[in-house]
C-alpha cells in the first residue's frame, strides 16, 4: 500500500471538552495526529500520495482514504495568457447602437393596437420577439419593452388560450403554448386548462401523424411549456409525456437541420438543468445556420447580430474574471492539497452560465470561491480527514476564532485560514450592497453544513447505514446548496431583507426543495463512485435498506420521481403570486439550483469534468462566437 510522505510538524493535538457548544474552552489532551503540510503564502510543506488506491497509510500508521479524482485541467499560466479584443470600447458602442435598434423593433410591435401590425399574427410576433431575446441571453436590455409586449398579449388571453393574432377567433396550440410558458415565467396568472381545448375525443393532444415543421414547432413549444408545471397539474404531465415522445419520434424522421438541433437541445437540457449561456450559444448557432439558408427575417437578423456581439463582449469579461479566480486559487495554497478536486474553472463556467449581467462580477467570484471551499471541505470530510481531526475542525469552525487552530494538523490550519479569511472578506464586501452585516447568516449556514458533513463522517467511521429519512434530512444540508447560494446572493445589487430571506433561505420551502433536488440528483449520479471510496450511505442504499428485496433500479425510479415532483414544487415557490417577494428576488437562488443540477444532468460532471463539462468550458467561456 502506498505511503504518504510526511514532513514532521506538530506532534501533539487537542480535543475539545465539548464539541457541541461554542462557548466551551479548548482542553489540550495530548494525542498524536498525522500532519500534512500545506503551502500558504510562501510556506510550503509538500505531501505526495497515490490516487490509484482507495486508502493510503501515513508514516505514523494513520490510514487515510483517497478520492481517485483527476487533476486540475486548466493550468494557471494558460488562464493568465487568455486575451480578447472585445473589451475595447468600440465594441460596447456598437452594442449600444444595436440595442437602440432592437428597442425600435419592440416599439414597432407595440403599435399593433393602432393597426400598424397585422391583426392575424401580431400576438405571435410579440411572443417570438420576447422568446428570441430571452433565449439569446440579451433580455436584460429590454425589460420595459418585454413587459409592454406581454401586457398586450395577456390582454387577449382567454380560458381557451390565444390565436396568432388579435383578430383570430380560433386559438392555436403553437401560440398558446409559447404564450403560456413566457407569461407564467413572468408572473402572469395562466392556467394549464387551456391545453384541454386542444385534445381530441380520446383525450389526446390533437395532431396529425405527419411531422410537418409547423406541427413540430407547436409540439416543441408544448414540451417547453410542460416543463414549468406546478404540483397537481395533470394536464401538464400528460403534455410532457406526449410531447417528449412525439419529438423523439420526429428526430428519427426529419433531416438534420436547425429544427432538429433545437429539439435535441431542449430534450437534453430541460428547464431545471438549462444554463442560459449555453442556450444562448446554441441558439446563436441555430439562427446562424438559418441565416446561411436565408430563413431569417430582417428583425431576427438584427437581434442575432446584437446577441453575437454581446456574447463576445461578456466573453472578454469572463476571461478577466477567470484570471482573478485562478490567481485566488493559486495563492490560497489549495493546489498543494492533492487529495481535493480542483474545479474552480468549472465553477466559474457554471456561474457565468446562469448570470451574464456584467455588473455582477462580485456575485460570480463569490460563488466560485464558496463552491471551491465547499469542495475542499467535502473532500476533507468524505475522504482524507481522520475522525479525530474532523472533530477538531468542526469545533474550530463553530468557534470561528483563528486562535483556536493551534490544535489542528497543519493541512487543516491552512484550510481553516483560507476559509476564515475568505468568508470574512466576502461578508465585508456584502455589507456594501446589503447595507448591513450578513456574516452571522453565512456562519450559521456554514456551521450547519459542516455539522451535516461531520455526521456523515461519523457514519462512515462507524459503518452505520441510516434510514432513508435520516440520511435525506441530513443530506439536504450536506448538499451544500444553501451555503453555495447564501453568500453569493448577498453580493448582488438586490436587497435581501429578513422577510425575503425567510422566503428563500432555511427553513423555507424554497430552500428545502432546492437542497432536496441537488441531494437526490447528486446521489443518483455519484452513488457507485462514492461506494467505491467507502461511502456506503446514499439515497439509493438507504432506500434499499428500508425496502428489503428492492433493487437499485427500484430505488432510482423512486428517487427520479421524487426529483420530478420536487422540481414542480420549486417551480411553484418561484412563480407563485407573492407581492412581498417578487420573482426577481428569488430568481438568483433558483438559477443556482439550475446550474448545480446541470453538473449532474447525465453523470457527475463535477467530479469527472474531463468530458461534457470540459466542452462546456470551451464553448461558453474560452471560445468567442464567430461574428
Swiss-Prot record:
Binding-site list for Mg(2+) 2: 378, 382
Main location: plastid
Protein source organism: Picea sitchensis
Classification lineage: Eukaryota, Viridiplantae, Streptophyta, Embryophyta, Tracheophyta
TM segment ranges: none
Function: Terpene synthase (TPS) involved in defensive oleoresin formation in conifers in response to insect attack or other injury.
Binding site for Mg(2+) 1: 378, 382
Pathway given in the UniProt record: Terpene metabolism; oleoresin biosynthesis
Cofactor note: Binds 3 Mg(2+) or Mn(2+) ions per subunit.
The gene coding this protein: TPS-3car3
Transit peptide: 1-36
E.C. numbers: 4.2.3.107
Keywords, in A-Z order: Chloroplast, Lyase, Magnesium, Manganese, Metal-binding, Plastid, Transit peptide
Location relative to the cell: Plastid, Chloroplast
Sequence motif DDXXD motif, residues: 378-382
Gene Ontology terms, MF aspect: lyase activity; magnesium ion binding; terpene synthase activity
Protein name in UniProt: Carene synthase 3, chloroplastic
One family name in Pfam for this protein: Terpene_synth
Note: Expressed only in susceptible trees.
Keyword Plastid attached: yes
Annotated residues for binding of Mg(2+) 3: 530
